[in-house]
Regions:
Chain A
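A short, proline-enriched helix->beta-strand linker immediately N-terminal to the Walker B motif
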Residues: 166-170
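The feature captures the beta-strand-to-loop junction immediately N-terminal to the Walker
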Residues: 36-38
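ABC ATPase "signature
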Residues: 229-233
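Conserved ABC transporter NBD signature motif
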Residues: 59-71
């Protein structure tokens, strides 16, 4: 079954520029789909539309976005509130900026949980602590009692992922979750997202411009350029047998380490 | 001038910043390094390892706390006999002419109210004392060198894309044929296809005028394809210096290996176990005893926590700071 399905989606901004043009693809349950493309290709717009958080002026011009069986466009605000958080969750590029700088991590974490599921603060605290431990954050107690500025970028990103994952959503949307991070931290975050998929069966849509990350994580890869979906296929198909010229170009311009192709 | 001539030499350069409550932060610690004509030296490392501070010291934007920087064997900035010396006045102007810098985000480099043409005319008017008319001709020529048409002369920065702006930043930097070009993450804000064009441009002009490049980056694959010498930094110290080619095979320091292990490449087997470096880097404030990497290193022994390893040569052009190499 498909968790998310996009049918002929077009998105227009107020300046009448079409940011996304007639894009259709589906995300099967428990699979990872990577959307790759360069800046301005509409990949972030697409993923924001999927959770119903288009920036001001953005509008779904045509097509349908189906979550499970339901059309997102006809949902009431209350239904949407339930879908977000429990059904699907999102991680942004600078997740640290989305944490409230004046409140401790534990307070905002527990509040987020209690918004969606009935529980006491104590229960929420326990769940949060367990989730942070799953994400291999060192010294969870310290992290819980810290203010966001006391944590490093990688730690904040992992806190955000933990928050997003602790409601066990069916679908996780990640908008460039690793591009602000160093390579070693990126490796940690990628590994943990893949572990979560394996353990909880969450489907993930990850937007990235890093072909390496896309190739590592994804089961399916979608290539976008200028708002159009250029190619969509399984990882093997897109990486080893690209059909579209733009995909081929994208693959050749990525700098490669020597001794990479022959497996060290 | 012949190739391989030494242009800039850093000797035991350190930089500490004073923080509140009498704490200090060691951004760069005891770094020795030299830049040669026609050679691209790359510095790689994670954020906070001091690579940008190092670049700012070489361009004399930041005073040196300890050690000395030499330009063609002349001391230009650092500590001498307990006194901080740095170039000033006309000499500093002359130095700036020869050492140019390209920054990470081209959008922040340009004044939004200045036309591209004015921006490109400036070096000629300020340094070569050209008339406006001549400078205009030179600006057209500069545009041509980076494959942009003359119509860009009358445009404003906001009308251009990041890649085009970066080209113009390069055009201005290389206008007066500098001897050293310092690129601080010059391509990391750009898309990969544009990154390739920019790198090709830098390479092409390097073949032409033979400037030395100090290339700061965190993209290991890019660095390998582009530079002849690679310097790996961790927490302000150099942990490994090696030749650019095939460094995946030659890397010896555990940190370099960890860095290489965390790069995802397109054609890797997706089922391959991801190598994860445990823990967080030590705090750069206060004194660090022993090896900077010891708290995350899998091979760390007692000696690593007691003594800081020094850089020792293991082959020509390859130095490693590790007790077990």
């Amino acid at each position: 079954m498909n968790v998310l399905e996009l049918r002929d989606v077009s998105i227009i901004y107020q300046n009448t520029k079409e940011a996304v043009k007639h894009v259709s693809f589906a995300v099967p349950e428990g699979k990872i789909v990577a959307i790759v493309g360069e800046s301005g290709s509409g990949k972030s717009t697409l993923i924001r539309a999927a959770i119903g958080l288009l920036p001001a002026g953005g509008e779904l011009a045509s097509g349908q976005i189906l979550f499970g069986e339901k059309d997102m466009a006809v949902m009431t605000a209350e239904e949407l509130r339930h879908v977000r958080g429990e059904g699907m969750a999102m991680i942004f590029q600078n997740a640290g900026d989305y944490l409230n700088p004046r409140r401790k991590v534990c307070d905002q974490y527990v509040e987020t949980l209690r918004c969606h599921q009935p529980m006491t603060k104590k229960q929420g605290y326990e769940i949060a602590k367990k989730m942070l431990a799953t994400l291999k954050l060192p010294d969870t107690k310290h992290v819980m009692n810290a203010y966001p500025f006391q944590l490093s970028g990688g730690m904040k990103q992992r806190v955000a992922i933990a928050m997003a994952m602790s409601m066990h959503p069916k679908l996780l949307l990640a908008d460039e979750p690793t591009s602000a991070l160093d390579v070693t931290v990126q490796a940690q975050v990628v590994k943990q997202m893949m572990d979560l998929r394996d353990k909880m069966g969450t489907a993930i849509v990850i937007v990235t411009h890093n072909m390496g990350v896309a190739s590592k994580m994804a089961d399916y890869i979608a290539v976008m350029q200028n708002g159009e979906l250029k190619e969509f296929g399984t990882r093997e198909q897109v990486i080893y047998h690209p059909e579209n010229d733009y995909t081929k170009k994208l693959l050749t311009v990525v700098p490669k380490l020597q001794g990479e192709t022959d497996g060290e | 001038m012949e190739n391989n001539q030494e242009i800039i030499r850093l000797e035991n350069v350190s930089k500490t910043f004073d923080l509140r409550y009498h704490k200090t932060l060691r951004a760069v610690d005891d770094v020795s390094l030299s830049l040669h004509k026609g050679i691209c030296t790359a510095i790689v490392g994670e954020s906070g390892c001091g690579k940008s501070t190092l670049a700012r010291m070489v361009t004399l934007l930041e005073p040196v706390t300890d050690g000395m920087i030499y330009y063609k064997n002349e001391p230009i900035g650092g500590m001498q006999n307990g006194r901080n010396i740095a170039l000033r006045g006309e000499k500093l102007r002359e130095y700036r002419r020869n050492v140019q810098m390209i920054f990470q985000d081209p959008a922040n480099v340009f004044s939004p109210r200045m036309k591209i043409g004015t921006f490109l005319m400036e070096p000629w008017i300020h340094y070569e004392k050209k008339s406006k008319k001549e400078a205009r001709e030179m600006a057209y020529y500069s545009l041509k060198r980076v494959y942009l048409g003359e119509e860009y002369f009358d445009k404003y920065p906001h009308q251009l894309s990041g890649g085009e702006l970066q080209r113009i930043a390069i055009a201005r930097a290389i206008a007066l044929h500098p001897e050293v070009l310092i690129c601080d993450e010059a391509t990391s804000a750009l898309d990969v296809s544009i990154q390739q064009e920019i790198m090709a441009l830098l390479k092409e002009h390097q073949d032409e005028t033979n400037y030395a490049i100090l290339f700061i980056s965190h993209d290991l694959a890019l660095v390998e394809n582009f530079s002849q010498q690679v310097v790996v930094m961790y927490l302000g110290r150099i942990v490994e210096i090696m030749n650019g080619a095939a460094f995946r095979k030659h890397a010896r320091h555990p940190y370099t290996k960890a860095l290489l292990g965390s790069v995802f490449s397109i054609y890797d087997d997706p089922d391959k176990e991801i190598y994860v470096l445990e823990g967080e880097a030590q705090s750069p404030t206060g004194e660090i005893k022993g090896c900077v990497f010891c708290n995350r290193c899998s091979q760390a022994k007692d000696i690593c926590r007691r003594e800081a390893p020094v850089l020792k040569p293991i082959r020509t052009g390859h130095q490693v700071a590790c007790h077990f190499v």
